């Protein structure tokens, strides 16, 4: 097992290096001069030249990349131009909010998706299967940001059941019930598409397992159907379901970017959008690399969990 984990960690290195190259080149190709954006009304040619020299932006592009990469490997993400504070400090402050939102959405889509998939497979071609399939297709078809805006109009503006935006109330909020009220709509909007995908693939995995000989044997021995479904079939199907959960975790994490903008959630996604608008290069580059590293790390955990369920994967 230790060798397999080490192999997965080593394989993650070129992925992360590739991400640093891509995000660096994308930020370099964005129109506009960062120094001009930072200086604003003070952007005289002399000031722009002085700031570019101070930030190292007058160096060749390849040299800028290797300087940034070298600092990154030492844990130095640089300093935000717009916020005038270390990039890593800003990311860590924002990441807790993103983790709460994405983590809640991931738990919801995992539980609801697997439950819907199992019930749909157990009642194949029945009323429950058709109803779940209809709801799943509808959920997959609706963009999360559009669903979020519709939820705001209905549940926040019209019915006033939930707050419109933010993470806490500005008037004496900050407790757990207040957080739950603010979290409900964005977490649901973020989880809908992933729930549908997990449900569809869980249904397929369950149907494949239910056709296998050991399930027929269990039923022939008189094992209760509930135990056959939830005890034997689901356990065997989890080998195929777990990789799906890992992939959807990435989609949930990336989807948090626009959901945070719709609901004004103070997370990393909103920070990245603000950084792009302000041409805060180091903030955007550091944020993308940090989120990518979290996604890669989570997928390694998923692969290890899958290898525990199916040792053949390690070979």
What name fits each language-model region?
Residues 15-66, 159-179:
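Hydrophobic alpha-helical transmembrane segments of membrane transport/permease proteins
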Residues 22-29, 70, 134-165, 189-195:
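Membrane-water interface segments at the C-terminal ends of transmembrane alpha-helices
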Residues 19, 36-39, 63, 78-81, ...:
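Short, hydrophobic secondary-structure boundary micro-motifs
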Residues 2-4, 13, 93-128, 144, ...:
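Alpha-helical transmembrane segments of integral membrane proteins
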Residues 58-114:
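An internal, D/E-rich "acidic patch" concept
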Residues 43-44, 56-57, 74, 78, ...:
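Residue-level marker of structural boundaries
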């Amino acid at each position: 097992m230790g060798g397999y984990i080490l192999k997965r960690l080593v394989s993650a290195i070129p992925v992360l290096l590739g991400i640093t190259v891509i995000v660096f080149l994308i930020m370099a190709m964005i129109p506009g001069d960062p120094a001009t954006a930072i200086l604003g009304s003070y952007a005289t040619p002399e000031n722009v030249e002085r700031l570019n020299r101070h930030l190292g932006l007058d160096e060749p592009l390849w040299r800028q990349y290797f300087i940034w990469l070298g600092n990154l490997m030492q844990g130095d993400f640089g300093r935000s131009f717009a916020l005038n504070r270390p990039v890593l400090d800003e990311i860590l402050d924002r990441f807790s909010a993103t983790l709460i939102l994405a983590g809640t959405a991931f738990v919801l889509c995992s539980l609801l998706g697997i439950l819907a998939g199992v019930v749909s497979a157990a009642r194949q071609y029945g009323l429950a299967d058709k109803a779940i399939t209809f709801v799943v297709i509808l959920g997959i078809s609706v963009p999360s940001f559009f669903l979020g805006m519709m939820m705001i109009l209905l549940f926040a503006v019209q019915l006033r059941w939930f707050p419109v935006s933010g993470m806490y109330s500005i008037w004496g909020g900050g407790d757990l019930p207040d957080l739950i009220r603010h979290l409900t709509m964005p977490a649901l909007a973020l989880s809908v598409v992933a729930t549908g995908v997990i449900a569809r693939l869980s249904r397929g995995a369950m149907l494949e397992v239910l056709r296998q000989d050991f399930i027929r044997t269990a039923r022939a021995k008189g094992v209760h159907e509930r135990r056959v479904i939830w005890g034997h079939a689901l356990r065997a199907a989890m080998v195929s379901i777990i990789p799906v959960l890992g992939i959807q975790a990435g989609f949930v994490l990336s989807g948090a970017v626009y959901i945070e903008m719709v609901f004004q959630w103070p997370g990393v996604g909103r920070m990245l959008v603000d950084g792009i608008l302000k041409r805060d290069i180091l903030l955007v580059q550091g944020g993308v690399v940090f989120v990518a590293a979290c996604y890669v790390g989570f997928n390694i955990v998923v692969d290890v969990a899958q290898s525990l369920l199916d040792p053949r994967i390690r070979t």
